[in-house]
Amino acid sequence: MRINPTTSGSTVSTLEEKNLGRIAQIIGPVLDVVFPPGKMPNIYNALVVKGRDTVGQQINVTCEVQQLLGNNRVRAVAMSATDGLTRGMEVIDTGAALSVPVGGATLGRIFNVLGEPVDNLGPVDTRTTSPIHRSAPAFIQLDTKLSIFETGIKVVDLLAPYRRGGKIGLFGGAGVGKTVLIMELINNIAKAHGGVSVFGGVGERTREGNDLYMEMKESGVINEKNIAESKVALVYGQMNEPPGARMRVGLTALTMAEYFRDVNEQDVLLFIDNIFRFVQAGSEVSALLGRMPSAVGYQPTLSTEMGSLQERITSTKEGSITSIQAVYVPADDLTDPAPATTFAHLDATTVLSRGLSAKGIYPAVDPLDSTSTMLQPRIVGEEHYETAQRVKQTLQRYKELQDIIAILGLDELSEEDRLTVARARKIERFLSQPFFVAEVFTGSPGKYVGLAETIRGFQLILSGELDGLPEQAFYLVGNIDEATAKAMNLEGEKK
């Protein structure tokens, strides 16, 4: 483990030993720095610019070397705003990649991309640090055990179950509920899981980051009285940060998670909200670094950058990282290069649909578009697999009949099709569920539904035992018993 040059002031104090350069050019977040002949820094080395701006304000900007240009020049991307920097300013090559604090000292704290605490709770113990650039675990170190990760969310557990130690993507356009779903998963899993979690806020709203922090304090995931007993480390690089920070903050969070997996041999949860912003930040600096844009203006290195991050998120024989990533889908187009590249790395995809969200069905998970490699009879068992397939078939038939219903109406359908439509509408509503984190909006207390209860509920609907109940009885309830109780209440109100 190296000492982190960006958080330990003493490491940069002896300038004589340091390799010094000067700023030659500043283009937004990208700097060109000239070094003496034969003293070029390596790719990914951290450079520090210290000094004062024209008004006398202290400047301390950390950059990361991206390209060696020739003529003793390097091109670097700044991790914070470049306001106040001028040509000719002195730049110090730290001689190492960016390193961040890791281990128990990170729990209960909020960090920026450089691993500096931003929660005003004092300094963090930086004796154990780790560089943010590492290679993925070797092939022989990987673990291949298959087991289900129960979330307590009906639609997920039944139709697209998550793999323990796998990678899960939540896909959706703007405002369909990705962050709320991630917060519910943190609430359900991080509390029940008992292990440690790392949350990487990549280019999302600062307000949401603050809400999450407050919620974690309320729920006890972050223990205010004894920070060391907290279960989560938070790393934020929000929308207002320069692209350099948004491009690297995911790696900072991942580095902290890797330490818990490799050294502490724990099972870790890694939440990333939002992985699309990682790609977006890369495309923002790509043109400034002189690369030719690829499809839809993305960086030509898109799949390489995504691969180098995703391949590190894996389960080894020491421990596992289960990663849940929100993926923003630009203009609801799943064929856009950013979500399309992400798809290739995932074990399960939970696709959020604007159509369901418009109907008021939350979580707005599309039961036909969402997929999982775990939905196989040998993994989940025959009963679960059969129920999931029958639910999908019923919903698919309903989808096919919708055009006929729109033109001719329900009365023109055969008796069998009318029954299918009635059951599909009940299933659609029963797939909705009140969330703990959304109690404020829905007014209904949150519900956690175990997998066995979920399967039983859908089997009862499919068998026809509940054909006599009104479909609104199935909307925003937990298990099937709540739906029957709600139906009785509705009957009572009618009388």
Swiss-Prot record:
Where does it reside? Answer: Plastid, Chloroplast thylakoid membrane
Give the EC number(s) under which this enzyme is classified.
Answer: 7.1.2.2
Q: Which InterPro entries match?
A: AAA+_ATPase, ATP-synt_VA_C, ATP_synth_F1_bsu, ATPase_a/bsu_AS, ATPase_alpha/beta_chains, ATPase_F1/V1/A1_a/bsu_N, ATPase_F1/V1/A1_a/bsu_N_sf, ATPase_F1/V1/A1_a/bsu_nucl-bd
SUPFAM superfamilies assigned to the protein according to its UniProt record, in alphabetical order: C-terminal domain of alpha and beta subunits of F1 ATP synthase, N-terminal domain of alpha and beta subunits of F1 ATP synthase, P-loop containing nucleoside triphosphate hydrolases
Give the residues annotated as coiled coil.
Answer: none
Q: A GO BP term, please?
A: proton motive force-driven mitochondrial ATP synthesis
Q: Which UniProt keywords apply?
A: ATP synthesis, ATP-binding, CF(1), Chloroplast, Hydrogen ion transport, Ion transport, Membrane, Nucleotide-binding, Plastid, Thylakoid, Translocase, Transport
Q: Which Pfam families match?
A: ATP-synt_ab (PF00006), ATP-synt_ab_N (PF02874), ATP-synt_VA_C (PF22919)
Q: Which EC class is the enzyme in?
A: translocase
The chemistry this enzyme catalyses reads: ATP + H2O + 4 H(+)(in) = ADP + phosphate + 5 H(+)(out)
How does the record classify its membrane topology? Peripheral membrane protein
Please give an example of a GO cellular component term from this record: chloroplast thylakoid membrane
Residues bound to ATP? 172-179
Keyword Ion transport attributed: yes
Q: Give the Gene Ontology MF terms in alphabetical order.
A: ATP binding; ATP hydrolysis activity; proton-transporting ATP synthase activity, rotational mechanism
| NCBIfam families in the cross-refs | atpD
> What is said about its interaction partners and assembly?
F-type ATPases have 2 components, CF(1) - the catalytic core - and CF(0) - the membrane proton channel. CF(1) has five subunits: alpha(3), beta(3), gamma(1), delta(1), epsilon(1). CF(0) has four main subunits: a(1), b(1), b'(1) and c(9-12).
The similarity comment for this entry is: Belongs to the ATPase alpha/beta chains family.
Protein purpose: Produces ATP from ADP in the presence of a proton gradient across the membrane. The catalytic sites are hosted primarily by the beta subunits.
Protein name, per record? ATP synthase subunit beta, chloroplastic
Source species, please?
Hyacinthus orientalis (Common hyacinth)
Lineage of source species: Eukaryota, Viridiplantae, Streptophyta, Embryophyta, Tracheophyta
Gene designation per UniProt? atpB
